[in-house]
A protein has these predicted regions:
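Solvent-exposed loop/linker segments at secondary-structure transitions
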Residues: 491-496, 500-525, 538-546, 562, ...
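A domain-start/cap signature at the N-terminus of enzymes
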Residues: 80-193
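Short beta-strand/loop motif that positions the catalytic acidic residue
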Residues: 306-308
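Gly/Ser-rich "nucleophile elbow"/oxyanion-hole loop immediately N-terminal to the catalytic nucleophile
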Residues: 185-191, 233-264, 276-280
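Solvent-exposed alpha-helical segments and adjacent loops
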Residues: 414, 426-429, 435-680, 813, ...
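C-terminal catalytic histidine-bearing segment of alpha/beta-hydrolase fold enzymes
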Residues: 313, 318-420
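Primarily recognizes the serine-hydrolase "nucleophile elbow" in alpha/beta-hydrolase
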Residues: 256-300
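Short beta-strand element of the alpha/beta-hydrolase
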Residues: 191-202
Length: 844
């Protein structure tokens, strides 16, 4: 066991023994609209719903230094007169009528999500639990009991104590999304208490993974995140943030002591959320989680306590060992315990769990004015802020944006900015003396002098190759563009999926199928149902309590167009909403051609288009348009939504072949929605584009040179993004977009281990680059092997190798490709072995 106790958490991750009820299927389409405020929209039952939450415009903490961190919540459920409603019988109509009364009363808005959730459970219990009549009766009885309880006592929310299931009303679709909350026995609204947010593992849910018991001192919160396997990204991520807002609104939470904890997928999610919103969280405790694909500098203000068994082959220990060593080197606060013998069940390591549980209450999020150093990388437009600094406008390249800021003596700010056109500084929240001049030294630029008294806010702007300081930020008639792909529509704001109703019968059926697949996903991809699922028949990768809202194009209202992000399915001929926008979109489907507004044209035969763009009718909202003349493009698992929605992407448009999973081309915008030229990017050699194996070797060669390393791993992608690229059309830019922020690491292996690894990965089409020459490998010599974050898990599962000498290196796959390309791969001599980071310097 290795144990680092350094200046920097998790509780037990419980393996689920059963699965809870889940989302609607097929025909159960929810057409309710929760917007605008006070507006009511009918659904099948005729019930009404009112808006209770504002859409999230990024995740911001309460104002630093204000009483918001300590005062009792100001927006508890308002006292309301008890309605004299006759006792309703337990029937289909009785609870429904009482629920309708609650949902139609704005002063009972705090209960709308809970009622919506109970309605869903009651309505779908028979279909999901036909063989469990007791469960069916229980769900229906719970709706009847709670509607009566709320109408009899509108302040019942204030009186809840102990462990309870609850739900909030999601602004995404008006559904009730559940969570479990432990309200401490000593809770007093006048005295805010800490909050620990638990994120469940894959196959789990908010009820089963959180082993909550009544106690005093702090709140516990377990969040579903839309699906059992939502990975706490896209809508699953938004769910956590919106539940946090809801709980903080209705209970007195100390926002300076909000902690994340999770195991497996939940541990990975805890690190993901902490890296995206460091200003929100006081600590992170993770069991067998992965930090491999996280911007590690983002975590320097968030203490981390990690437990990971050395023999975990489901989520290999390398996913924490290397990244957390890198975080430590960056100045982070990290504790890592690596016992052995627990596999993926390291929550059974009682001593480590006890230490982590004792550690986290001591962690307090720093006040904004105490934070003198920030090192933040933004991957998309949903998470662009760290404490007092925020990206106001992206730079010109389709890659992540980064700022590194350090406050020095005498009101001096040292700044290193990459791919940023405008950086917003909240000086009133920063550690500067407002009565003294500010000197800003941006790397490579003349010093900027800001006279005293300092403004509350300042924007650093890059204009005409020079930096200036201004007291106002960028202005545009549309929402500014940010990279990241179609998941930016899945940020917690209102969302509507719109399918076309025009064309032949087969096309219309395909469009409806596509809408159904999209409605069951918590992100912009349209995945096929996972093979595994709960005892309710819901696949782990599908929304558990309600599909996303769907409408036919002919039913879309002006309010829908103005207030929602829109997923548009179909061509202008197939979808009338697309037809109304087509002339103002940057690409059009004209017969057998795609016409781009920069004058370029390309074939549309056997091809599908995916596009992310602002909505011309509502410039603050986004659209995600998927279109093809071939109905086969609208099947679940289609490549265009996969490429733009499964992971962050540098592409804003993709053209894919329909007949097989091949990427033809991708395109990206600058911050003002102007196409970046493809002509400046080199064509992929035809022989590489046509062969995924050869292309993988070429990518590995670039990674090996950049690391540097003796060998690099080729193949074993996880997940596979595409099988091939279109010869004669695909360019290096397409490869870069699909490797958007893919970190690289290097492990050190003995020659004997390297040979054994090569044999172990060969049956799975994994190879080493350059090819292993057994006659030249010395068994006891050390060799450096480079691999990407996506290759770690399959490599360790096949080889069972998790070497001590393992480090995350600077740069990523895209940077390696930008520097070395995929042509001309001269052999590079074996490199000298560099020293291992101090924290990892242990014997083999």
């Amino acid at each position: 066991m290795r144990y680092w106790m350094l200046p920097v958490a998790l509780c037990a991750c419980v393996t689920p023994t059963s699965s809870a009820p889940g989302p609607a299927t097929g025909s159960d389409v929810n057409l309710v609209s929760a917007f605008p405020t006070g507006a009511a929209s009918p659904i099948e039952s005729g019930w009404l719903v009112a808006k209770t939450m504002q859409p999230r415009q990024g995740a911001h903490p309460p104002e630093q230094g204000s009483e918001a961190l300590t005062q009792a919540p100001s927006a508890e459920p308002a006292a309301a007169p008890v309605v004299d409603v006759p006792e309703a019988p337990l029937s289909a109509d009785g609870p429904a009528l009482l629920a309708q009364q609650i949902l139609s009363r704005p002063e009972l808005a705090a209960y709308h999500g809970w009622i919506r959730y109970l309605e869903f459970r009651a309505a779908h219990a028979s279909a999901r639990f036909a063989d469990q009549p007791g469960a069916v009766v229980e769900d229906r009885l719970r709706l009847a009991q709670w509607t009566r309880k709320i109408l009899d006592n509108p302040n019942v929310l204030r009186e809840l104590r102990g462990v309870t299931e609850w739900a909030y009303l999601s602004p995404v679709d008006g559904s009730g999304q559940p969570f479990k909350l432990n309200i401490p026995s000593d809770y007093d609204p006048a005295h805010p208490l800490p909050l620990s947010i638990e994120l469940h593992g894959r196959s789990g849910n908010h009820l089963e993974d959180a082993d909550m018991r009544e106690h005093a001192g702090y709140f516990e919160l377990s969040v579903l995140g839309r699906a059992r396997a939502g990975s706490y990204r896209a809508l699953s991520e938004a769910d956590v943030l919106q539940v946090l807002d809801y709980v903080s609104q209705h209970w007195a939470v100390d926002r300076s002591r909000v902690h994340l904890v999770g195991g497996g997928m939940g541990g990975t999610g805890a690190l993901w959320l902490a890296s995206r919103y460091p200003q929100l969280f006081a600590s992170g405790r993770t069991v067998c989680g992965s930090a491999s694909d996280k911007p590690l500098g983002n975590l320097i203000t968030v203490p981390i306590y990690a437990l990971h068994s050395e023999d975990d082959y489901r989520v290999p220990v390398l996913h924490t060992r290397g990244p957390l060593a890198k975080l430590l080197a960056l100045g982070g606060n990290v504790t890592l315990e690596e016992p052995n013998g627990y596999g993926h069940a390291v929550w059974k390591y009682e001593q480590g769990t006890a230490r982590a549980d004792a550690w986290f209450p001591q962690q307090v999020r720093p006040e904004s004015r105490e934070v003198k150093r920030l090192d933040f990388t933004a991957l998309d437009g949903a998470a662009v802020r760290a404490y007092w600094a925020e990206i106001a406008e992206w730079g010109p390249e389709p890659k992540p944006a980064h700022f590194a800021l350090k406050v020095g003596s005498k009101n001096r700010l040292e700044a290193r900015l990459d791919n940023i056109r405008s950086l917003h500084l909240r000086l009133a929240e920063a550690p500067f003396d407002a009565d003294q001049p500010l000197r800003v030294n941006i790397e490579g630029a003349p010093v900027l002098n800001v006279p005293a008294p300092l403004p509350a806010e300042l924007w650093l702007e890059h204009v005409d190759s020079s930096w200036t300081a201004a007291e106002s930020g960028p202005v545009a008639p549309f929402r500014l563009h940010t990279p990241g792909g179609a998941n930016q529509l899945y940020d917690g704001e209102p969302l509507l999926i719109v399918y076309g109703t025009h064309g032949d019968a087969a096309t219309q059926a395909a469009l409806r199928v596509a809408a159904g697949a999209a409605s069951r996903s918590s992100n912009a991809s349209w995945p096929k149902p996972a093979r595994d699922g709960g005892n309710d028949g819901v696949a782990y990768n599908q929304n558990l309590y309600g599909e996303l809202n769907i409408k036919a194009d002919v039913d879309v209202t002006p309010e829908d167009r103005a207030q929602r992000h829109l997923v548009l399915i179909g061509t202008a001929e197939q979808n009338s909403v697309v037809a109304a926008l087509a002339a103002r979109l940057p690409v059009r489907l004209e017969g057998d051609e795609l016409a781009w507004n920069d004058g370029s044209r390309s074939s549309a035969r056997d091809r599908a288009l995916g596009l992310v763009h602002y909505n011309p009718d509502a410039p603050s909202r986004l659209i995600f348009w998927v279109a093809s003349n071939d109905a086969a493009a609208y099947a679940a698992g289609s490549l265009a939504p996969e490429l733009l929605g499964a992971l962050p992407s540098g592409a804003d448009a993709v053209v894919v072949r329909v007949s097989d999973p091949t990427l033809v081309a991708s395109r990206s915008f600058d911050s003002r929605w102007r196409w970046l030229s493809r002509d400046q990017s080199a064509l992929l050699p035809a022989e590489l584009a046509a062969s995924s194996a050869d292309l993988a070797r070429a990518v590995a060669a670039a990674v090996r040179r950049a690391a540097p390393a003796d060998f690099a791993l080729a193949g074993l992608p996880e997940p596979a993004r595409t099988s091939a690229y279109e010869p004669g059309e695909a360019r290096l830019a397409d490869l870069l977009a699909q490797n958007y922020f893919t970190p690289v690491s290097v492990m050190t292996l003995l020659g004997s281990e390297l040979v054994a690894a090569a044999h172990a990965i060969a049956p799975s089409d994994g190879v080493l680059e350059p090819e292993l020459d057994l006659s030249r490998i010395q068994p006891q010599r050390e060799y450096r092997l480079a691999l990407s974050a996506r290759q770690i898990s399959p490599f360790v599962r096949l080889t069972h190798l998790a070497p001590r000498k393992y480090e995350v290196v600077e740069g990523d796959v895209a940077r390696a490709l930008s520097r070395y390309g995929v042509t001309g791969m001269p052999s590079v001599p074996a490199v000298a072995n560099r020293a291992t980071p101090p924290a990892l310097a242990t014997s083999r």
